[in-house]
A protein has these predicted regions:
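Active-site nucleotide/adenylate-binding loops and adjacent lid/helix of ATP-dependent enzymes
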Residues: 106-201, 205-224, 228-251, 383, ...
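Active-site "cap" helix and flanking loop/linker of ATP-utilizing ligase/carboxylase catalytic domains
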Residues: 242-263, 282-334
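A short beta-strand motif that forms the metal-chelation/ATP-contact edge
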Residues: 274-284
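Peripheral (often C-terminal) accessory segments that flank ATP-dependent C-N-forming ligase machineries
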Residues: 306-396
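Short, solvent-exposed loop/turn segments that connect beta-strands within catalytic domains
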Residues: 210-211, 269-275
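Short beta-strand micro-motifs enriched in acidic
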Residues: 205-207, 266-270, 355
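ATP-binding N-terminal substructure of ATP-dependent carboxylate-amine bond-forming enzymes
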Residues: 1-108, 112-115, 135
């Protein structure tokens, strides 16, 4: 897609959660037709899409069939639990997979993206090792020093992750990783525990033609591997930002294609001596980047769609301090409702997005509060207050 093409275009989303919903809205504003695909009916992007399809996303034949039936101009993976081998086949047939089928395959496996970053590109990462049994995990963890972080090589949203304080916790960590892992392989990555001052996402935009662009860095807090709040712009020194941008450019150049990537880093070390450490990468809009709906002239979703379609991005501009705070469910329920919107939306410079998920479970992200402020502190306080006002009701 290196030359101008007529509109409307047809985009297929593989994964139709809250991030896919915002991609669909951004695409439709440009007159595009959107096909939303997911494993369950009523996924957030489906009500706003032109067509909805429900398939087993890890079933290669089902994935090939739905893509060939619609033959979209662009296929945009929005989740990690996909039949990636089928994407490679479809790409070979001429289907435009975003950013590339290889990028999707590499980044869904923590071992492959870590080997690329640390081994192939020489980026600074936490010290790490792999293990394929509890016994091997114990042997691999000890040289890293305690505590260590254990993660399945394939999982999402923090599933299966744990911090292990010493040898006595290895068996439980292995069991947790296997329970939270995706796929059939029994493999984990074990990392040294980094005592970091800040965790950031650098949204990186690769264009078909034109330079790689960067959004202002986003600070965020995670619990159990899942995003809880984010703010923009995060405060980094000029040198630190330059290092992060160089790392992000190196890894996204290697993965190729076009679109927006969420590249995560840790900032570690004594004040004034912090170093930037590569953590992970998603080849798609990032959950921490929901804050860009309040904090930028073009949100991460607008940027992704423009980059994918080869449209110009003249400027990425901050609109001032902005923050987000997630709205979580606390119980399991087949139906949900909400109260407290009046209280939440009374917070100045705030907005609330409810994702429209059809059911709830403890810890499931049901919405997000966004806010702007004169300062980052004020923006974060407003986002927190707005989120606290919304209550997820799981019974009538």
């Amino acid at each position: 897609m290196t030359t101008p093409t007529p509109f409307p275009r047809t985009l297929m989303l593989l994964g139709s959660g809250e991030l896919g919903k915002e991609v669909a809205i951004a695409a439709q504003r440009l007159g595009c037709r959107v096909i939303a695909v997911d494993r369950y009916p009523g996924a957030p992007a489906m009500p706003v899409a032109d067509v909805a399809e429900v398939i087993a996303m890890t079933d290669a034949e089902a994935l090939r069939t739905v893509v060939r039936r619609h033959h979209p101009d662009v296929v945009i993976p929005e989740i990690e639990a996909l039949a990636v081998d089928a994407l490679a086949e479809l790409e070979a047939e001429g289907i435009n997979v975003i950013p590339t089928a290889r990028a999707t395959a590499v980044t869904m496996n923590r071992d492959r993206i870590r080997d690329l970053a640390a081994g192939g590109l020489g980026l600074r990462t936490a010290r790490f090792a792999y293990a394929e049994s509890a016994e091997a995990l114990a042997a691999a963890a000890a040289p890293l020093g305690w505590p260590v972080v254990v993660k399945p090589v394939m999982s999402s949203s923090g599933k299966g992750q744990s911090v292990v304080q010493g040898p006595d916790g290895i068996a439980a960590a292995w069991e947790a990783a296997m329970a939270g892992a995706r796929g059939t392989g029994a493999r984990v990555i074990v990392e040294e525990f980094l005592r970091f001052d800040l965790e950031i996402t650098l949204l990186t935009v690769k264009q078909w033609q034109g330079p790689t662009l960067f959004c202002p860095p986003i600070g965020h807090v995670q619990e159990r591997g899942d995003y809880q709040c984010s703010w923009q712009p995060a405060v980094l020194g000029e040198g630190q930002l330059a290092v992060a941008q160089a790392m992000a450019r190196a890894v996204t150049d290697d993965l190729g294609g076009a679109g927006l990537f969420g590249v995560e880093f840790f900032l570690c070390g004594a004040p004034g001596e912090e170093v930037v450490v590569f953590s992970e990468l998603s080849p798609r809009p990032h959950d921490t980047g929901l804050v860009t709906l309040a904090g930028q002239n073009l949100s991460e979703f607008d940027l992704h769609v423009r980059a994918v379609l080869g449209l110009p991005i003249p400027e990425i501009r901050s609109l001032g301090p902005a923050a987000s705070r997630v709205i979580l469910a606390s119980e399991t329920a087949d139906t949900v409702s909400y109260t407290g919107l009046e209280q939440a939306l009374a917070v100045p410079e705030s907005q609330v997005l409810l994702f429209g998920k059809p059911d709830a479970r403890p810890g499931r992200r049901m919405g997000v509060a966004l806010a702007r402020g004169e300062t980052l502190v004020q923006a974060r306080e407003r986002a927190d207050a707005a989120a606290a006002g919304v209550r997820v009701r799981t019974s009538v």
